Design a protein with these regions (language model features):
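Classical eukaryotic N-terminal signal peptides for Sec-dependent ER targeting/secretion
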Residues: 1-11
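N-terminal signal peptide
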Residues: 11-26
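Primary mode marks residue(s) on the alpha4-beta5-alpha5 output face of response regulator receiver
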Residues: 22-292
Length: 292
């Protein structure tokens, strides 16, 4: 069955390779979770790009105003799945996504990485009581999300967003750091080039080096296709299974994404914590048609 899925995957990718490989990638799609089986509803799953569509798809709004709290925008979650909490601006257009891991699950993991000390994770209560560590990313300038938002015309022209901002602290405006939109602008930054993986792209890891300590591990990797940011991924130490949106790369597969030489602490932390749980977010229309 796996061989059939891989064969189908290859055929679809080959057919799509004939579609304008020279044009710049656009952000017209919003999907999560990588996988080989294109027939699975879990793989490259589409997420709603508008607040109204989110409601019709079964997502419910979390408590909180658009601004004035730990995060920006109106947040929507489906059921109790904190792995993909979608953020919309005040006009109801997609503005970002959060990736959350319940504190109860984190406390079961044997890891030297501190979720409390990492500025990339913010602890928040949802549904009145459950504490969740959230990584928050925005797809438009954080300053506009609750200050006018995007117009319908802007959304139609720009698609899912105009860039990627990672909230790296308690203030969603002041502490949100923009990731370079083009790969050429990575030069001279702290982003370190890792491996290229077909159907994903070229991975970049912030501050990664051979002798780093995993207490400094940054849980977001930026991924480029044909020189432009087209997707990214969240990655946390621990084997979390509360959501079907998670990916669980083997230790061997994980090394394919990492910089060379591979940070020594990551393999150690992988064994100690029981693995890594990741979730890719894709903006390109046909993410499975990405070649190295």
């Amino acid at each position: 069955m796996l061989s059939s899925a891989i064969g189908l995957f290859a055929v679809v990718a080959l057919l799509n390779s004939f579609v304008s490989v020279h044009s710049e990638p656009t952000w017209q799609s919003f999907r999560v979770t990588w996988g080989l089986n294109l027939l699975s509803s879990r793989t490259f799953a589409k997420l709603p790009q508008t607040e109204s569509r989110a409601r019709s798809d079964g997502f419910a709004r979390l408590a909180g105003e658009c601004s004035g709290g730990k995060f920006l925008g109106h947040r929507y979650m489906k059921g109790l799945d904190t792995a993909a909490v979608i953020i919309y601006d005040e006009n109801g257009y997609v503005a970002g996504i959060q990736h959350g891991i319940p504190k109860n699950d984190v406390e079961k993991v044997n890891t030297s990485f501190s979720f409390d000390r990492s500025s990339a994770y913010q602890l928040d209560k949802i549904l009145g009581e459950e504490e969740v560590y959230f990584i928050t990313t925005y797809f438009v300038d954080p300053n506009i999300i609750c200050n006018g938002g995007r117009t319908k015309l802007q959304y139609e022209e720009e698609g899912v967003g105009t860039g990627l901002w990672v909230q790296n602290g308690t203030d969603p405006v002041r502490d949100s750091v923009q990731v370079p939109l083009y790969e050429k602008d990575m030069e001279g930054t702290h982003w370190v080039k890792g491996g290229c993986f077909r159907t994903m792209g070229v991975h970049y890891w912030y501050g990664a080096h051979e002798n780093m300590t995993c207490t400094d591990f940054f849980p977001v990797t930026a991924i480029y296709n044909r020189g432009k940011l087209t997707n990214f991924a969240f990655a946390s130490f621990g084997n979390y299974e509360f959501s079907r949106r998670f990916e669980h790369p083997s230790s061997t597969a994980l090394t394919l994404f990492l910089p060379t030489p591979i940070p020594k602490c990551i393999n150690d932390e992988y064994e100690r914590s029981g693995g890594v749980s990741s979730m890719h977010v894709f903006f390109s229309v046909r993410p499975w048609n990405t070649f190295c």
